Amino acid sequence: MKNLFSIQGKTAIVTGGSSGIGAMIAEAFVQNGVKTYITSRKADALEEKRGAFSLDGECIAIQSDLSGNDGINTLYKEICSYESKIDILINNAGTAWASSFEDFPEKGWDKVMDINLKSPFFLTQKFLPLLKKSGKEDDPSRVINIASINGITHPLMPTYSYSSSKSALIHLTRHLGADMARNNINVNAIAPGFFPSKMTSHIAKNEALSAEVIKKIPIKRMGSPEDIAGTAIYLCSRASSWICGQTIVVDGGMIAASG
């Protein structure tokens, strides 16, 4: 039972690791002894986080556009120039689009689906050889897909493609979880509720909306970095080695209270 929750010495990739939930997870990984690669399209934000995280451990930044296979292939080649295996892949990079149903544009559907659903699938496919090399029966490699409570319950905003992509990602997690287990790779998902991030900044800036959201959360607050980091650490440690194809909701009880 000793060191059951340790992730020290592992190597991880966190996509979208320069902000929001991705940055929260990446920072926790670095602080807990994980060699962590973070990716983002935005070089300045990426370098800022790399500099901050590197004060506590090893963090490498790679600028990447993962909306298509060209960017995924480029990232894979660069990672392979450093690593022969990977222990953890966090599919966190994502985007959203809000518009009324009557005016919702095709580009708002395609862009969100490409980044939120297609990218995790093809990233996992591409990195399969490196994940297989690392996986052991008693401590499998891990793929963690960052979903959302919006993929489970009715969203507050008209984010049709976002909620659909996250719902599909939850089912993809179940599918891949069952299929990848034979390779000693555990695939799970985290469905966060409301955390401080760029995507939820409109809530934080609106006092009335913020109060309305918190009123719906039994634990009367927004999520903290420790809340999401603790879940990610658990899912990447030996403590979760028999957890596969599952989605853990981290929302302060919001879905439970909704009935």
Whereabouts are the PLM-identified features?
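Short C-terminal tail/terminal secondary-structure segment
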Residues: 2-4, 233, 244-259
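Conserved glycine-rich cofactor-binding loop
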Residues: 11, 18-19
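Substrate-binding pocket helix/loop in short-chain dehydrogenase/reductase
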Residues: 100-101, 105-113, 213
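Active-site helix of classical SDR
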Residues: 124, 165, 173
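Alpha-helical segment proximal to the catalytic Tyr-Lys
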Residues: 129, 178-179, 241
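Residue(s) in the substrate-gating loop at a strand-loop-helix junction
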Residues: 148
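Short, small/polar-rich loop/turn modules that mediate ligand/substrate recognition or access, typified
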Residues: 181, 186, 243-245
